[in-house]
Design a protein with these regions (language model features):
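Non-heme di-metal
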Residues: 2-395
Length: 395
């Protein structure tokens, strides 16, 4: 963060305020900064990066830009009228849960992470991340307005659902702990004291970074596990040729969430590799807590599956299968972070293999006149062509 300096340095220099600033006039080499809690950013420049992977993720997210209105839901409205009460319960409950998750993600990164980011490429990736989450929330509204005769029947009942509220507490706790602690730190003398090498200031900043670490892990779990029971249910309807437009939209959302999962994985990986020595210590100290976070999430998602299928199964899907699927997904996410699997499900034995083509939209081949093409990438040009790139080609 920025050192405390005199408000006015000279008649020819802009004042540099204490604390956070929207534009830092100090010359800062961002390649030498940690990802978080460094000096505030100044010029938004995207020509050199400490971690190019974050710029690649920005480009990928921008290339995948889409709008829900591109997908027709005309058939979904009539399909919904043919669903059984149990199927309607599954479809509507999952929509409510997805609305909760993306309402959190639609503002969470901007409130908790972006104010303390110290690298322009990471700031950029997170800004696009938050924007895409807004697209997701608008997508749920688009589905609800087209499928239900009265959208208020869904929206107004979200906060009345005890199962949803129970999810909200576990999803938002780590976010709220970080946001409140960071705000207190930023508005008190702790912000200035953080630049002094004293035990108190170092301890306070380390504990704040610990909350940041937990929040990033929490989001990794949210993006990587919490969506997947509802994803599987949406895709199951699509497999039955029901609610296909909604399934297509959820497939687009899942593609974006995969990018956001990768973003959190890359942040955690950089910490493990020593981006911030304090974070290396914190990562080692938090290993058992991370495992507990994964266990709690898996247990909650199993409970959610039980709730969804409390009235019976649907063709190709039931609560027991979803239990195994959640364990399978959790093992994969743990392995990506360098942890051993927690559950007795082989990493290559997907209990719901038919979900793969929905999660990997690039693998779908659709005739343009039949359905919306979702594998199209906007601005997908290769820009690293060198002088000798075509040396072996002849006309």
């Amino acid at each position: 963060m920025k050192k405390s300096v005199s408000p006015v340095q000279s008649n020819n220099e802009m004042p540099i305020p204490d604390g956070m600033t929207v534009f830092n006039t100090e010359d800062v080499d961002t390649n030498k900064q940690h990802m978080f809690f460094g000096k505030p950013l100044g010029v938004q420049r995207y020509d050199k990066y400490k971690y190019p992977v974050f710029d690649k993720l920005t480009q990928q997210q921008l290339g995948y830009f889409w709008r829900p209105e591109e997908v027709s839901l005309q058939k979904d409205r009539s399909d919904y009228q043919t669903l059984t009460d149990q199927q309607k319960h599954i479809f509507t409950s999952n929509l409510k849960y997805q609305i909760l998750l993306d309402s959190v993600q639609g503002r969470g990164p901007g409130m908790a992470f972006i104010p303390y980011v110290s690298l322009p490429e990471l700031e950029s990736a997170m800004l696009v991340w938050e924007f895409m989450e807004m697209i997701h929330s608008r997508s749920y509204t688009y589905i609800i307005k087209n499928v239900y005769s009265d959208p208020s029947d869904v929206f107004d009942k979200i906060l009345d659902d005890d199962k949803i509220i129970a999810r909200a507490e576990s999803v938002t706790k780590a976010y709220n702990n970080l946001i409140n602690a960071a705000q207190n730190w930023g508005t008190s003398n702790l912000y200035k004291e953080g630049h002094k090498e004293t035990y108190t200031s170092s301890y306070e900043l380390k504990e704040l970074k610990r909350l940041l670490y937990r929040a990033i892990v929490n989001v990794n779990i949210l993006e990587g596990i919490r969506f997947y029971v509802s994803f599987a249910c949406s895709f199951a309807f699509g497999e039955l040729k029901l609610m296909e437009g909604s399934a297509k939209i959820i497939s687009l959302i899942s593609r974006d969430e995969s990018q956001h999962l990768t973003l959190t994985q890359q942040i955690l990986k950089r910490w493990q590799e020593g981006d911030d020595p304090t974070m290396v210590d914190i990562a080692n100290e938090e290993r058992e807590n991370v495992l507990d976070m994964f266990r709690n999430c898996v247990d909650e998602e199993k409970d959610w599956a039980d709730y969804l299928f409390s009235g019976g199964s649907m063709i190709g899907l039931n609560a027991k299968l979803l239990h195994r699927y959640v364990e399978f997904i959790a093992n994969r996410r743990l392995r990506a972070l360098g942890f051993d699997p927690l559950y007795d499900v082989p990493l290559r034995n997907n209990p719901l293999p038919w979900t793969e083509h929905w999660l990997n939209s690039k693998g779908q081949q659709n005739a343009p006149q039949e359905t919306e093409i979702e594998s199209y990438v906007v601005g997908g040009i290769k820009q690293d062509v060198k002088k000798n790139s075509f040396a072996g080609f002849k006309l």
